[in-house]
Design a protein with these regions (language model features):
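Non-ligating segments of multi-cofactor redox enzymes
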Residues: 1-177
C-alpha cells in the first residue's frame, strides 16, 4: 500500500510563493481562494525580529474528518492514500469545510463545490511529482511514502522529530514540518 505525504521544510522556505502560483495555474484556482498558501510567522521584537514562512494546505489526514462527514462521499481516499475530491458528487453543503481543523477547503466561486489540495493526483498517478514540488527553488516541499521506510517522510515520522499541525485533533496528518 502507498501512503503519500509531504515534508514541508519551513527553514528552507524563502516565501517566494512559487508553490501558490503554480498551484493556481495547474488547477485553474480562481482569485480569492487558494489550495496552497504561505503563512508568515514573525518572531522577536523590534529591533531584533525574524520572519519565517510556512506552507499551508490540506494535510491528507489518515483520519480525515472532511471525508467522514461528507454526505455524498465527494471526498474520498485515492489508492495512493491522497484525500481527493469528486466535483460531480459535491453538493456544496460546506460540512467538510466546517469539519477540517486546518481550514484547507474552500467553495469554488463558479461551481459552488468544495475544492482543496489534491496532491496533484492527476500528475502523481502518471509518475510525476506535484507541481509545487517541481517548482520549489529551495526544495522546501518534498513528497514521500509513509509505507516506504527509506523515504524521508517515513523516517521523519518514525523519529518523532517532525511536527504536525494541531496534533490534538487526532487526524494523523500526512504533512510533516
Amino acid at each position: 500500500m502507498t501512503r503519500l505525504g509531504f515534508v514541508l521544510d519551513s527553514g528552507s522556505c524563502i516565501g517566494c510563493h512559487a508553490c501558490t502560483v503554480v498551484c493556481k495555474s495547474e488547477h485553474e484556482v480562481p482569485l480569492g481562494v487558494n489550495r496552497t498558501w504561505l503563512k508568515y510567522v514573525e518572531t522577536g521584537s523590534h529591533p531584533q525580529t525574524d520572519r519565517h514562512f510556512s506552507v499551508m494546505r490540506c494535510n491528507h489526514c489518515e483520519d480525515a474528518p472532511c471525508m467522514s462527514i461528507c454526505p455524498t462521499n465527494a471526498l474520498f481516499r485515492a489508492d495512493n492514500g491522497v484525500v481527493d475530491f469528486d466535483d460531480d458528487n459535491c453538493i456544496g453543503c460546506k460540512s467538510c469545510m466546517n469539519a477540517c481543523p486546518y481550514d484547507a477547503l474552500y467553495i469554488h466561486p463558479e461551481t459552488m463545490t468544495a475544492h482543496k489540495c489534491n496532491f496533484c493526483n492527476h500528475r502523481v498517478t502518471e509518475g510525476l511529482e506535484p507541481a509545487c514540488v517541481v517548482v520549489c527553488p529551495t526544495q522546501a516541499i518534498r513528497v514521500g511514502d509513509l509505507d516506504d521506510p527509506n523515504s524521508e517522510l517515513a523516517q521523519l515520522h518514525a523519529s518523532g522529530e517532525g511536527l504536525v499541525r494541531s496534533p490534538e485533533q487526532n487526524t494523523k496528518p500526512r504533512v510533516i514540518y
